[in-house]
């Protein structure tokens, strides 16, 4: 195939914020949505409709083939498609992975982030400074908190797990009828099922530690910046000023009292729900009289 590269691409339209964020957090990740969260770009070409470097004399590109947008509405059974390219997809998950999402991933994420967000909201309401510092952090946390709620609701409403099981039964029948030596596709689903079942407990603990500590307790963030900047052990820091600037940005929006409250609650949750704790918890129990002293 032939490819032409048009470099003169211009932003020509965006809706106002009141439309782009219509519904706010309440409607986030809920369907159907009425949010006009989009931008419009236009390709510009030379007067001969060929690729051209940017120029004020360029004109909108004229496509030989295009889809006409109808203003007549739609009827049941009309063709529909999604425009865009996802960075990743979960559409090929097995029923075993769907079950893990419904019983481990989403419930943990909803509960842990909800506990953290309650603390953030209390401190944000009590202080304008904290409200400004934590507005973006709260929004980031609540984004996939709400996503997990909407995802679970949609999976259950659409009976996705049962549909996956039907697909797997059909695949199994095909595999048993068509597998040959060296290509035992009839064993694939069983292997996936056993691997998921064997790793569920470790997965649950890892996710709990990730959500409750790595994603929730901020004081560990500067250490991650240093590790990322230095890289391998013993390597010299190549750009100290860039690291300092990143750390200044972190501390500008950091409130130790809020983070301490969050940390205390997160440690409580980890100690209550994770069976095999990391060594740091064992060391802390021997060093401090209680959780308040440790935090």
Per-range role (PLM):
Residues 1-295:
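Terminal presequence/propeptide segments associated with secretion/organelle targeting
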């Amino acid at each position: 195939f032939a490819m032409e590269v048009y470099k003169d691409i211009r932003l020509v339209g965006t809706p106002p914020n009141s439309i782009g964020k219509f519904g706010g957090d309440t409607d986030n990740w809920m369907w159907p949505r009425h949010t006009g969260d989009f931008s419009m770009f236009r390709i510009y070409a030379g007067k001969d409709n060929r690729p051209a470097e940017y120029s004020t004399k360029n004109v909108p590109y004229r496509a030989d083939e295009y889809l006409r947008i109808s203003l007549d509405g739609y009827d049941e059974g009309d063709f529909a498609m999604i425009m865009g390219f996802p960075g990743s997809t979960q559409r090929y998950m097995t029923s075993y992975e769907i079950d893990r999402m419904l019983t481990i991933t989403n419930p943990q994420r909803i509960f842990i982030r909800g506990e953290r967000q309650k603390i953030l909201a209390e401190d944000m309401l009590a202080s304008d400074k904290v409200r400004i510092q934590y507005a973006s952090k709260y929004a980031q946390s609540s984004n996939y908190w709400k996503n997990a709620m909407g995802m679970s609701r949609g999976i259950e409403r659409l009976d996705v797990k049962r549909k996956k099981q039907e697909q797997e039964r059909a695949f199994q029948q095909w595999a048993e009828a068509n597998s040959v030596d060296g290509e035992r596709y009839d064993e694939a689903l069983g292997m996936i099922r056993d691997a998921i079942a064997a790793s569920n407990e470790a997965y649950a603990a890892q996710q709990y530690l990730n959500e409750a500590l790595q994603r929730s307790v901020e004081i560990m963030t500067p250490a991650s910046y240093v590790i990322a900047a230095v890289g391998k052990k013993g390597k010299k820091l190549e750009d100290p000023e860039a690291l300092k600037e990143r750390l200044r940005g972190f501390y500008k929006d950091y409130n130790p009292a809020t983070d301490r409250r969050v940390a205390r609650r997160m440690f409580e949750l980890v100690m209550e729900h994770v069976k095999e704790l990391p060594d740091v918890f064992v060391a802390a129990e021997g060093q401090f009289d209680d959780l308040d002293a440790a935090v």
